[in-house]
Each structure stands twice: as structure tokens, then as C-alpha cells.
Amino acid sequence: MSKPADHIKRPMNAFMVWSRGQRRKMAQENPKMHNSEISKRLGAEWKLLSESEKRPYIDEAKRLRAQHMKEHPDYKYRPRRKPKNLLKKDRYVFPLPYLGDTDHLKGLPVSATDSLLGSSEKARAFLPPTSAPYSFLDPSQFSSSAIQKMTEMPHTLATSTLPYASSLGYQNGAFGSLGCPSQHTHTHPSPTNPGYVVPCNCTAWSASSLQPPVAYILFPGMTKSGIDPYSSAHAAAM
């Protein structure tokens, strides 16, 4: 690839003036040494030179710069290659998510469009239905068998299936459904946000107070207090 005819080299600085002879000498002494390694060694040696040793090369660089300005008064440095940071920006372009067609907004004036998108609640109407909060917790989306499995999940987790649950405070019932030891803060389902749990500092439950859930069928004139739980469960099953 041929160089452009109008390309003008930059004037050499003091280090380039000094290293011009030193590079040739080091390349002759080490013919197998790579050029990058030679540049590293020359840079280290240049830093070790004193100011008096650098002075002749600094003066020579000033003379070359003045001569360059006389020969090329309109010279302006133009790098051939882009800086590395610009190359990275061009290479790694972050893709934008596709938000759907906006044809329904083209007929609106600019002020009306801004007013529609200014409110977060109004802008939510233009998003797909799956982006609604807590849509994955809608009970209507689950079948009866799925709900039954969800209710059995705390009992399954309570049988030490998760060895790290104790370190997180979920002991004797991963979601606070069975145990509530006094040394740990257990949780309850949040009444306002489905799917979330909130901490509760209630007292510990005794083992005798934990009874299996019993289904009651109350007829008119009957109360729950006088019914034997096991007999009522048998009657409910019948």
C-alpha cells in the first residue's frame, strides 16, 4: 500500500532524536530482539538519563521543529488511525430494544405526544400486556394442580432440601409457614404486594400449637368450638 504523496511527517521530539542512533546500535547487538522490546528498553534508558545528558537532544528537537514550521507553515497533525476509545465505541454499539410500531402516535401533534408520554401510568398503556407488574402472580393463570404444588412447596423445603436455608434465617419452613423460632425473624406474605414477604417479630410457636389443617363444614346453628376436629374432618370427607 503506497503512502499518500501529501503526507507530512511530524517533527521528531528529543527522545526520537536520541533513540534514532541507539535503536540502530541495539538492533545490531541483538538481531533477534523484537522492535517492541527495543522500544521498551530505550524508553527505560531515556528515563535514567540526567537533564544535562538530555539537553543536547532537546535543543536539536527544538531546531528541527522550527525548521519544520518554516517548511510547512500550514501543517496540522492529522492521525492516520482513530484513537482506541473511538474504535471501541464503533465496535461495541449497545442495541436498543424494539418497542413496537408507533404509527398510532404519528397523527398526534407534538404537544399531545409529550403529554401522553409524560406520565408513567399513561405511558404504560402503550407497553405490551406482559410488562404489567405482578402479571406472573395472577392466580387465574395457574391450574388447581399448580396451586396445590405451590402450597406443598414450603413443607418440601422444610425437610432440609436446601442446606443454605438455615443461614438465611428460613428454618423449619422456608417461607415462615411452619416454624418461627425466637432467635430468627420469620416472614409472612405481604397483603398488598402478592409474591413478596415481610418480616415479622412475633413470638415463637410451640410444637403443640402446630396442628394439621382441618376442613370444617358448618351447618346452620352449629359452631366450630364444639366440634372434634378429627370427627369433623371425617364428616367433611364423607
From Swiss-Prot:
UniProt keyword annotation of Transcription present: yes
GO biological process terms on file: brain development; hypothalamus development; negative regulation of transcription by RNA polymerase II; neuron differentiation; positive regulation of transcription by RNA polymerase II
GO cellular component: nucleus
Taxonomic superkingdom: Eukaryota
DNA-binding region, residues: 8-76
Keywords on record: Developmental protein, DNA-binding, Nucleus, Repressor, Transcription, Transcription regulation
Record SMART domains: HMG (SM00398)
SUPFAM superfamilies, per the entry: HMG-box
Function: Acts as a negative regulator of transcription. May function as a switch in neuronal development.
Name by which UniProt lists this protein: Transcription factor Sox-14
Lineage: Eukaryota, Metazoa, Chordata, Craniata, Vertebrata
Gene behind this protein: sox14
